């Protein structure tokens, strides 16, 4: 049975107990949230993934994407990126490999980590199709579903599937005033397949079969936003909302079948529309966990899109988003390297912290309180311990010497906290 089915039967699983303990939440409250579809625990029955809860009343989680491309493929490089994202606190990882060695890379990632692993199966189906000297849109239904079955058996915990890309959705794009059309790689591949074959999307037409596969292995569905806006001009348009309403119906079918499900959200959204997008999604999709890419709140900062995404993600998380997909400085420019991965994870961790302050998560509030106390006490070691990136904080602090170890080089003798404390001490004497 799936975690959702156990929860609905009133049974508390070891996975629920683990999540409740790590989140410091009542396990019965957690069970009810899982039973209602507001929380998922992406954990395939075939692996030893650490149970990680995503959704209502829990810490905001972050995902980091790695993986090869047809232009750059090196297993060791991808594993080095994995080490970095684990070091800086990613809660999940997605392997988005599209190169010939994608099987080897996924297995290496699975063998090296126990955090939830996600994929986009249609990438592998496309690679398999082109390896047979066919064009990618000639992939048949069997390859798509065979790929999903094989990945489920291998222990993939959650899969992004673009079930909302339908013939009607493509018409909505044609009827819209979009500047950039379809920018999701999986969404574009699916749309091209539909147009080439003049048939409905197999993942939509055979959704019940997809649910059977996921139910057998307790693979969590992540319903992809194939029509997400690729620029702020296209945000919250009819095509995006048309797909979202389809996903809302699919959420209900998934939950009815006992399959865990979350929904992916928009990519580029002006800051004035972020909160509304979260509210629309939560309403249409029955409060299923929301997994957002950013959203990026401006289009003119290439090289700094980890910052534009963190701004949007902070608002999104504070407004109800549950799962943040990191964005690196390399977004829109190149395949990310190790430093890009580091910067992307840290930026997303900051956004998650900001989100959890808004959600008043008790352990987050305690961490913020403890940091204030440490600063007031000039307890530098404690500050480094509590910091999201204590390594960098320590490096900056130690980069310059001061006459008094309590002070940093910014203010020196003009340190506001020390000045008041010294006068208070003198007055007492």
Curated annotation (Swiss-Prot):
GO process annotations (BP): thiamine biosynthetic process; thiamine diphosphate biosynthetic process
InterPro entries given in the database record: ThiC, ThiC/Bza_core_dom, ThiC/BzaA/B
Cofactor(s) essential for the protein: [4Fe-4S] cluster
Residues annotated to bind substrate: 65, 94, 123, 162, 184-186, 225-228, 264, 291
GO molecular function, one term: 4 iron, 4 sulfur cluster binding
Domain of life where this protein originates: Archaea
Reactions that this protein is recorded to catalyse: 5-amino-1-(5-phospho-beta-D-ribosyl)imidazole + S-adenosyl-L-methionine = 4-amino-2-methyl-5-(phosphooxymethyl)pyrimidine + CO + 5'-deoxyadenosine + formate + L-methionine + 3 H(+)
Pathway field: Cofactor biosynthesis; thiamine diphosphate biosynthesis
Keywords: 4Fe-4S, Iron, Iron-sulfur, Lyase, Metal-binding, S-adenosyl-L-methionine, Thiamine biosynthesis, Zinc
Claim: Iron is one of the keywords in the record: yes
Broad class of enzyme this protein falls into: lyase
Protein name as annotated: Phosphomethylpyrimidine synthase 1
Upper taxonomic lineage: Archaea, Methanobacteriati, Methanobacteriota, Methanomada group, Methanobacteria
């Amino acid at each position: 049975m799936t975690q959702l089915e156990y929860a609905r039967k009133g049974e508390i699983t070891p996975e629920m107990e683990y999540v409740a303990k790590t989140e410091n939440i009542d396990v019965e409250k957690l069970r009810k949230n899982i039973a209602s579809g507001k929380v998922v625990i992406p954990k395939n029955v075939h692996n030893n993934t650490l149970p990680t809860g995503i959704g209502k009343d829990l810490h905001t989680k972050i995902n980091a994407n790695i993986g090869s491309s047809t232009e750059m493929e090196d297993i060791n490089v991808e594993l080095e990126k994995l080490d970095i994202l684990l070091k800086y606190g990613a809660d999940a990882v997605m392997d988005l490999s599209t190169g010939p060695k994608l099987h080897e890379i996924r297995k290496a990632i699975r063998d090296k980590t126990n955090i939830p692993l996600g994929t986009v199966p249609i990438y592998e189906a496309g690679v398999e199709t082109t390896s047979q000297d066919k064009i990618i849109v000639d992939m048949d239904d069997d390859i798509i579903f065979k790929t999903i079955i094989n990945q489920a058996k291998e222990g993939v915990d959650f899969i992004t599937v673009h079930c909302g890309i339908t013939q009607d959705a493509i018409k909505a794009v044609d009827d819209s005033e979009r500047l950039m059309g379809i920018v999701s790689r999986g969404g574009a591949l699916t749309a091209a397949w539909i147009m080439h074959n003049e048939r409905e999307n197999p993942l939509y037409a055979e959704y019940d079969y997809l649910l059977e596969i996921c139910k057998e292995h307790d693979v969590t569905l992540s319903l992809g936003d194939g029509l997400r806006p690729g620029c702020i001009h296209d945000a919250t348009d009819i095509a995006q909302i048309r797909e979202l309403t389809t996903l809302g119906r699919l959420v209900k079918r998934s939950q009815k079948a006992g399959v865990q499900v979350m929904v992916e959200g928009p990519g580029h959204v002006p800051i004035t529309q972020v909160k509304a997008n979260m509210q629309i999604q939560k309403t249409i999709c029955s409060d299923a966990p929301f997994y957002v890419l950013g959203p990026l709140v401006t289009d003119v900062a290439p090289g700094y899109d980890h910052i534009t995404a963190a701004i949007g993600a902070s608002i999104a998380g504070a407004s109800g988003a549950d799962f943040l997909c990191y964005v690196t400085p390399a977004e829109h420019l190149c395949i990310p390297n190790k430093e890009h991965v580091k910067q992307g994870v840290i930026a997303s961790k900051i956004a998650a912290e900001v989100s959890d302050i808004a959600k008043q998560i008790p352990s987050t509030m305690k961490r913020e309180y403890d940091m204030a106390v440490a600063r007031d006490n000039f307890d530098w070691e404690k500050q480094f311990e509590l910091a999201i990136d204590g390594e960098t904080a320590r490096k900056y602090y130690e980069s310059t010497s001061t006459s008094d170890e309590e002070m940093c080089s910014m203010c020196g003798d003009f340190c506001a906290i020390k000045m008041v404390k010294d006068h208070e001490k003198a007055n007492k004497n």
